[in-house]
């Protein structure tokens, strides 16, 4: 490839890439070309309206100069006529006008460096000037670019796109020039396009000046790339660098619609809906303009979503489908949760089987309502309760039999049902935790404080009403007889002491068994003195003052060891010192029970007691 001459004003690029050409017959046609170009430029300037006065966002005069005013109808007609003439001269037939010819292609910033790592100029940075046969494509491309720039400036006045007056001059000059397509205005070096790239490759514009941050101003002679250290041609302030894009280098551009994406360090201009007032919808215009690009240059749908395009009309249908699918998924999950809740609510509430009294109420309620004028349910229930208690045992037995059959039928229908299922779950958890705690205390706490029948099954504590029934009310505890909180139910939770009743006495409890009465050890007695209040006084036996003699120590030793093994087999209890004496003959142990009871009462009377705390003995 020919090299550049050294040390000239044309030495502005790499030696292996750029070559400078001069026009043939430039001296002869210079005057005529200059006059025609100046005449056309004057016509264009006279028909344009300066729009920089309405733009308040311009920060300098250079930006106002770079921002071209909108074109008039006359220039638009001329551009279209020249475009049609150039299209008629084409022999390939691949160029077809878009549905809206005023928006022919898309402006894309140069997001990557135009230089490759090895120092050579990439194909994306090559200037488009080529010739196929005797047809000029540079004129067509330049005019097409002018139409695109003018359209963008008209539709988006805030979008800064360079367009200089020399470009229109270059377009008109190239359109009329019969010389080969190596003519350059203002000595801008150009390179012939490679032969393997199709001459009809669409033109995609770049602007390093306005999009890429960190580049020096275009009027400064920055000949060295700060990143690679390779000399590069500076762009004049009135000519923006436009490069063609070859098919093989499309993958180097990360965002084909990057001119709509604000880059780092760039001022973000809001693109409102007012700027998108097209004769056609925005999405249709973009799709129609992109239909001219080859399939490999059209960006995929997912890039439109990831680039964050502000206007909603540019979002493709696939993105809308994805969002709708996510919404449908969230709605489906919420509906699934609601259906679960509804299923729990729709779960049938299994009622408890009716007991005997409920069956009686069900049968006799209509009669009571017919006899009485009362409509209150509480009053009717009271009347039914009085009549139920007035019934004889034989009459009640009929309803008890019906209740038993009702329970059997209920167990057949709902085998795993429990009445606890109808109550709260928190209470159910507490009941599940209680059996483990009560089993730990079941060995030693067998009710030494109260003389009640022992509880055999502590894992399922029941009240006296459920344990003994109505027929054995003599075995109920005092609180259950007065319809208070059951003592056995409290014992099932691990406590052995019952709260005092409303009247402060425990006289309503059933009488204690004789085998549990005995002289308690000192430790146990002191414990009972501390725990029991002073008001819990028991009636003393009237025969207790008759026998004041101390009992034989052998009897105390035998009974103490027997009670210690019966009350708490795990713990060792201290015995009184009199019990440690040698045992008497067996004949002295076999005494009547009355004498032993009197001896215990006399021992209790001789020992110091707080106030009137004495044990009650059986007659």
Curated annotation (Swiss-Prot):
There is a cross-link at residue 320 (Glycyl lysine isopeptide (Lys-Gly) (interchain with G-Cter in SUMO)). One of its GO terms (molecular function) is transcription cis-regulatory region binding. Changing residue 322 to A: Loss of sumoylation. Residues 1-11 have a biased composition (Gly residues). Changing residue 24 to A: Reduces CTNNB1 binding, and abolishes CTNNB1 binding. The keyword Ubl conjugation applies. It holds the Pfam family HMG_box. A motif (Nuclear localization signal) lies at residues 425-430. Residues 1-53 are annotated as: CTNNB1-binding. One of its GO terms (cellular component) is beta-catenin-TCF7L2 complex. Changing residue 26 to A: Abolishes CTNNB1 binding. Residues 496-508, 574-603 have a biased composition (Low complexity). InterPro entries: Catenin-bd_sf, CTNNB1-bd_N, HMG_box_dom, HMG_box_dom_sf, TCF/LEF. Residues 47-57, 318-328, 604-619 have a biased composition (Polar residues). GO terms for biological process: blood vessel development; canonical Wnt signaling pathway; fat cell differentiation; glucose homeostasis; maintenance of DNA repeat elements; myoblast fate commitment; negative regulation of androgen receptor signaling pathway; negative regulation of canonical Wnt signaling pathway. Changing residue 17 to A: Reduces CTNNB1 binding. Residues 201-395 are annotated as: Mediates interaction with MAD2L2. It is linked to Constitutive activation and subsequent transactivation of target genes may lead to the maintenance of stem-cell characteristics (cycling and longevity) in cells that should normally undergo terminal differentiation and constitute the primary transforming event in colorectal cancer (CRC). Participates in the Wnt signaling pathway and modulates MYC expression by binding to its promoter in a sequence-specific manner. Acts as a repressor in the absence of CTNNB1, and as activator in its presence. Activates transcription from promoters with several copies of the Tcf motif 5'-CCTTTGATC-3' in the presence of CTNNB1. TLE1, TLE2, TLE3 and TLE4 repress transactivation mediated by TCF7L2/TCF4 and CTNNB1. Expression of dominant-negative mutants results in cell-cycle arrest in G1. Necessary for the maintenance of the epithelial stem-cell compartment of the small intestine. This is Transcription factor 7-like 2. It comes from Homo sapiens (Human). The gene is TCF7L2.
């Amino acid at each position: 490839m020919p090299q550049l001459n050294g040390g000239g004003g044309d030495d502005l690029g790499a030696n292996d890439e750029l070559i400078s050409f001069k026009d043939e017959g430039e001296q002869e046609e210079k005057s005529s070309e200059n006059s025609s170009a100046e005449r056309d430029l004057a016509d264009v300037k006279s028909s344009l309206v300066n729009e920089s006065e309405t733009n308040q966002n311009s920060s300098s005069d250079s930006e106002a100069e770079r921002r071209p005013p909108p074109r008039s109808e006359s220039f638009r007609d001329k551009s279209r006529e020249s475009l049609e003439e150039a299209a008629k001269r084409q022999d390939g037939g691949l160029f077809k006008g878009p549905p809206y010819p005023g928006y022919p292609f898309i402006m894309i910033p140069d997001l990557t460096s135009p230089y490759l790592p090895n120092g050579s100029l990439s194909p994306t940075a090559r200037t488009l000037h080529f010739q196929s046969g005797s047809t000029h494509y540079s004129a067509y491309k330049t005019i097409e670019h002018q139409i695109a720039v003018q359209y963008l400036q008209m539709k988006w006045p805030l979008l800064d796109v360079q367009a200089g007056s020399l470009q229109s001059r270059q377009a008109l000059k190239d359109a009329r020039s019969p010389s080969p397509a190596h003519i350059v205005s203002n000595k801008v070096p150009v390179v012939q396009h490679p032969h393997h790239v199709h001459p009809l490759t669409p033109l995609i514009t770049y602007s390093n000046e306005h999009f890429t941050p960190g580049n020096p101003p275009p009027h400064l002679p920055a000949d060295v790339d700060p990143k690679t250290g390779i000399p590069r041609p500076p762009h004049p302030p009135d000519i923006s660098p436009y490069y063609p894009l070859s098919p093989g280098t499309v993958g180097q551009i990360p965002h084909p619609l990057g001119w709509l994406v604000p880059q780092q360090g760039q001022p973000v201009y809001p693109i409102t809906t007012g700027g998108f007032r097209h004769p056609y919808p925005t999405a249709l215009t973009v799709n129609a303009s992109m239909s001219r690009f080859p399939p490999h240059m059209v960006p995929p749908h997912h890039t439109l979503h990831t680039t964050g395009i502000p206007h909603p009309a540019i979002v493709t249908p696939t993105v809308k489908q994805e969002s709708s699918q996510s919404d449908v998924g969230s709605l489906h999950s919420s509906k699934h949760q609601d259906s679960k809740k509804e299923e729990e609510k729709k779960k049938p509430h299994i009622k408890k089987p009716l007991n005997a009294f409920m069956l009686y109420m069900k049968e006799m309620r209509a009669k009571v309502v017919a006899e009485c004028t009362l409509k209150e349910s509480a009053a009717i229930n009271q009347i039914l309760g009085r009549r139920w208690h007035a019934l004889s045992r034989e009459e009640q037995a009929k309803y008890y039999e019906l209740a038993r059959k009702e329970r059997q039928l209920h167990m057949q229908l709902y085998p795993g049902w429990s009445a606890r299922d109808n109550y709260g779950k928190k209470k159910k958890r507490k009941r599940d935790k209680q059996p483990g705690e009560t089993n730990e205390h079941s060995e030693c706490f067998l009710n030494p404080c109260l003389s009640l029948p022992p509880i055999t099954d502590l894992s399922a504590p029941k009240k006296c009403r459920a344990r003994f029934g109505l027929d054995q009310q003599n075995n109920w505890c005092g609180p259950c007889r007065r319809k208070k909180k059951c003592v056995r139910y409290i014992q099932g939770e691990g406590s052995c002491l019952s709260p005092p009743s409303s009247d402060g006495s425990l006289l309503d409890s059933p009488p204690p068994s004789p085998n549990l009465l005995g002289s308690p050890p000192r430790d146990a007695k002191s414990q009972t003195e501390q725990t029991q209040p002073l008001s819990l006084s028991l009636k003393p036996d009237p025969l207790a003052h008759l026998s004041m003699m101390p009992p034989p120590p052998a009897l105390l030793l035998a009974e103490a060891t027997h009670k210690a093994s019966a009350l708490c087999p795990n713990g060792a209890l201290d015995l009184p010192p009199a019990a440690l004496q040698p045992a008497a003959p067996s004949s002295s142990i076999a005494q009547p029970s009355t004498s032993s009871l009197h001896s215990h009462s006399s021992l209790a009377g001789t020992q110091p007691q707080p106030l009137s705390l004495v044990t009650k003995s059986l007659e």
